[in-house]
């Protein structure tokens, strides 16, 4: 519905309406990034906790099971670029505010691509090639009686003593920590740029309404 309205407003060059509809779509991406980072920060904390626990050779604790079950998880942001493609097809040069045009293009063609390829693609490649096979070998997933759908999963080590000396698992955890930290930082930078863009659009709409 929103995309159809954008198309109609672009044809009519009704820029106030275009910007308002565009804000609705970009705001959805902004919120998606915030939620994804909230999840990733929790899972990053789990990975760090497990690695510190294993490096210190501390005894097994059932409190770690939720971390064993979720440490390798990774969130994925759904980026909507259809509104941007609509503007491109109709001619981005129709946008008179060149500062906004530059920022819109940068966010859609660079920042979104960076998050999707450099971050999420690496996460999924590592998950399929190394993390999941090792996790299935070293851990057994379970769900407590109190578990509810959409809550974090749990897992117990098959042999905790062997896990203490498993360098591969520790190296995988270190890699997860590194990649997830980079992913979180990139998504935060993207969110800041989106926030600045939304402020710029708000100013543009105010000026258009004042004419």
Label every PLM stretch briefly.
Residues 19-33:
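Hydrophobic membrane-insertion alpha-helices, especially the h-region
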Residues 1-16, 30, 37-211:
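Long, hydrophobic alpha-helical segments that serve as membrane-spanning/inserting helices
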């Amino acid at each position: 519905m929103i995309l159809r309205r954008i198309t109609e407003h672009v044809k009519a060059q009704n820029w106030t309406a275009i910007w308002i509809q565009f804000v609705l779509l970009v705001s959805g991406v902004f919120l998606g990034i915030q939620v994804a980072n909230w999840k990733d920060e929790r899972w990053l904390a789990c990975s760090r906790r497990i690695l510190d626990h294993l490096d210190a050779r501390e005894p097994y604790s059932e409190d770690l099971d939720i971390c064993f079950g979720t440490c390798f998880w990774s969130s994925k942001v759904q980026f909507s670029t259809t509104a941007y493609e609509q503007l491109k097809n109709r001619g981005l040069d129709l946008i008179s505010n060149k500062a906004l045009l530059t920022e819109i293009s940068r966010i859609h063609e660079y920042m979104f691509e960076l998050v999707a390829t450099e971050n999420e693609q690496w996460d999924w490649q590592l998950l399929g090639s190394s993390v999941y096979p090792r996790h299935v070998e070293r851990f057994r997933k379970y769900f407590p009686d109190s578990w509810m759908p959409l809550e974090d999963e749990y897992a117990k080590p098959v042999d905790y003593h062997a896990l203490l000396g498993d360098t591969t698992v520790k190296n995988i955890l270190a890699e997860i920590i590194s990649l997830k930290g980079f992913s979180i930082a990139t998504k935060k930078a993207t969110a800041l740029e989106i926030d600045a863009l939304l402020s710029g659009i708000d100013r543009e709409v105010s000026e258009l309404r004042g004419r």
